[in-house]
């Protein structure tokens, strides 16, 4: 039998030393914080104020230094390089897992860490909003979606590409071409505020 350790008491005891009048501890991402954790904080430190600072932090994150911009650009370059190289490597008969392995290896060769798991979906699996790559083999004429997220210096780029494997029908080919046109038109219409 596994015993699950209840850490609430230990956390509560550790937090009590911070219970001081006038102390403020900002909470960011309050919509993600479990209620039980909020309850531990407020009951352990009843004299502390817990202002919501999500908007303040979001505004601060909008301002980037030249170094941060450089890291973001580097992550984007790595993403582009990996997806470009994948186009040359991917073959009918490979598994989704093999595509993931190639993407992750290429990204790491270029010095990136992974911001999140690489998503590879092919054929019938492309109908899911997110997918854990499987041993499903890539088939002739299928769509293949790759979502790769390289991270450099804690800055992550999230980019994806939809491939059309050789042997696709005219319908799929036209659908992909038209989707790409719409995407380009949409991007060019976006204006900074």
Question: Which ranges hold each PLM region?
Answer:
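Active-site neighborhoods and metal-handling regions in enzymes and metal-associated proteins
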Residues: 1-193
């Amino acid at each position: 039998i596994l015993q699950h350790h209840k850490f609430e008491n230990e956390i509560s005891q550790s937090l009590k030393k911070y219970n001081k009048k006038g102390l403020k501890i900002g909470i960011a991402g309050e919509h993600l914080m479990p209620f039980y954790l909020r309850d531990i904080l407020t009951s352990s430190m009843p004299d502390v104020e817990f202002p919501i600072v999500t908007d303040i932090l979001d505004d601060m994150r909008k301002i980037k230094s030249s170094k941060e911009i450089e890291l973001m650009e580097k992550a984007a370059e790595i993403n582009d390089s990996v997806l470009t190289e994948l186009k040359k490597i991917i073959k009918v008969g490979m598994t989704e897992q093999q595509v993931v392995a190639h993407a992750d290896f290429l990204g790491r060769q270029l010095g990136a860490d992974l911001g999140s798991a690489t998503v590879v979906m092919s054929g019938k699996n492309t109908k899911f909003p997110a997918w854990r790559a499987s041993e499903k083999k890539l088939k002739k004429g299928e769509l293949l979606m790759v979502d790769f997220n390289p991270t450099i210096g804690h800055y992550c780029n999230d980019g994806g590409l939809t491939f059309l494997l050789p042997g696709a029908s005219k319908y799929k080919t036209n659908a992909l071409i038209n989707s790409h046109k719409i995407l380009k038109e949409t991007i060019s219409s976006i204006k900074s505020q």
